[in-house]
Amino acid sequence: MNFPLFTGCATALITPFLPDGRLDEPALRRLLAMQTAAKMDALVLLGTTGEPCTLSMDERERIIEIGLECTGGSIPVIVGTGSNDTRRAIEYARQAQRLGAAGQLSVTPYYNKTTQSGLIRHYHAILDACPLPMILYNVPGRTGMGLSADTAAALSRHPSVVGLKEASGNSTLTGEILEKTRRELPIYCGNDDQILPMMAQGSCGAISVVSNILPDKTRALTRACLERRMDDAQALQLELMPLIRALFLQVSPIPVKAALAMMGLIHDELRLPLVQMDEPYRSRLKQALLDARLLS
């Protein structure tokens, strides 16, 4: 049995920047305070939502340090360590372990795609070099390749593999993974619009974008699912759907950073090649925030 790092809801936190492009440490601390106040079950730093591909090793270190300082050990802090260079992924994993992270989230290699056997060798190489507990991350829409159910089952036998963030949007694949791993590999929903159906199917939680905006309600949705209060879960999922749709009008994290800026929590700054949200999408996002009573 692979024991999960958490059950419930983890926020895939954004990385705030100043207008001059530097890391906005005060804003990061505000966001972390908002998450801890909502009693989130875990936090993911430097995941896709955190723009890790445009951060230096020093910036990564500072973000992890602040995350661990602000949470004070109250919840697991999981660090995104994925790379399409296995050697770099090992460096990221060792950094996260050295600083005290509870675990790592490792996306399948992108662009220079590999085979399923290559995926197994990639992940085993990382874990042989650094056994920091790992949540695998399957998001073929971004990486261009997917993790098969057989590969997930093979990797689940490694003692340091403690979960899978499944963001393919393929419920059949989720079912196959649950079947082939005998439900012993914890699976986390990686798509906010599918939290209820995936948790009803057997997932143990979610790694969420919308929880950057509404951490309390997103966590309440996952708790309702875990406690099998499906009427409550359905109501919460439906309540969140308009905002979820708005947060994916353009490529994430562009909309979620625009939303947080409208709420006065951060500057609306991203690092190229990401750019600020276009019209008419920005107006639609603002209306969704108004409808959710997050703006006045």
Residue ranges and their predicted role:
Residues 3-11, 16-144:
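Active-site beta->alpha loop and helix N-cap motifs at the rims of alpha/beta catalytic domains
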Residues 5-15, 34, 38-40, 49, ...:
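C-terminal alpha-helical cap/extension of soluble enzyme domains
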Residues 24, 85, 187, 249, ...:
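Charged, low-complexity surface patches
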Residues 28, 60, 64, 89, ...:
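A general structural signal for well-ordered alpha-helical segments in protein cores
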Residues 55-58, 91, 116-119, 147-149, ...:
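Short secondary-structure transition/capping segments
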